[in-house]
Regions:
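Glycine/Thr-rich phosphate-binding loops of Rossmann-like dinucleotide-binding domains
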Residues: 37, 112, 177
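NAD(P)-binding Rossmann-fold cofactor-contacting core
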Residues: 50-74
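Rossmann-like NAD(P)-binding element
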Residues: 59-65, 79-163
């Protein structure tokens, strides 16, 4: 999809969207303030005909980043003349309300906490280049994320569309997905967009 270059995307889906597609479901992205990840994720979804008419509800704790990402996604939708709707709120529960698909791509603690996931193991002789998913750094990251993931699950159970699917992209992906599956009481799948 053509983003913000002001050109119509060759092969845009807009011309192929007929009355058979209705804006009948909502996709919520929690942690949508990451411009690179959210833009790529939603751009990919907009290549699927069933998603070009849905509502994308973006939520993040950082209102500045959230607004930037919303503008980028709205530009993608507009340039490609798609009927998708884009909303943004810092109220996570409002964003989840009525959603069929809820995606988590949060980094609890931000980059500051991430640096401690590397520094603490290194202090004890464990040199790991990334602390996202494995080793001591991954465990530290999981301890920060799992309580938040379970809060998301509570909201999903209470206000999302019945039978909604929670798609976890947040690292440590396996730990977060396991916690949501074992203790969250929601339908959940763990995914890695970068593989």
């Amino acid at each position: 999809l053509q983003a913000a270059k002001g050109k119509k995307c060759a092969g845009t889906l807009a011309a192929n969207v007929g009355s058979e597609f209705n804006m009948s479901f909502k996709v919520t992205v929690i942690g949508a303030g990451s411009i690179g990840f959210t833009k790529t994720l939603i751009s990919d979804l907009l290549k699927v005909p069933e998603f070009v008419t849905c509502e994308f509800a973006l939520t993040d704790i950082n209102p500045h980043n959230l607004d930037m990402v919303k503008q980028v996604i709205e530009t993608i939708v507009s340039v490609n003349r798609l009927p998708a709707k884009v909303t943004a709120t810092t109220d996570r529960r409002a964003a989840i309300t009525g959603a069929r698909y809820i995606m988590s791509c949060v980094r609890v603690g931000g980059l500051e906490a991430f640096s401690t996931d590397i520094a603490i193991p290194l202090k004890y002789g464990v040199d790991q280049c990334v602390g996202d998913t494995i080793c001591a750094g991954g465990i530290l990251y999981g301890q920060r994320n799992i309580p938040v993931i379970l809060d998301f699950c509570k909201d999903i159970r209470e206000v999302a569309e019945p039978g909604a699917l929670f798609l976890n992209y947040a690292n440590p992906m396996a730990m977060n997905t396991w916690a949501a599956d074992m203790y969250g009481g929601v339908n959940v799948v763990g995914l890695c967009h970068g593989v």
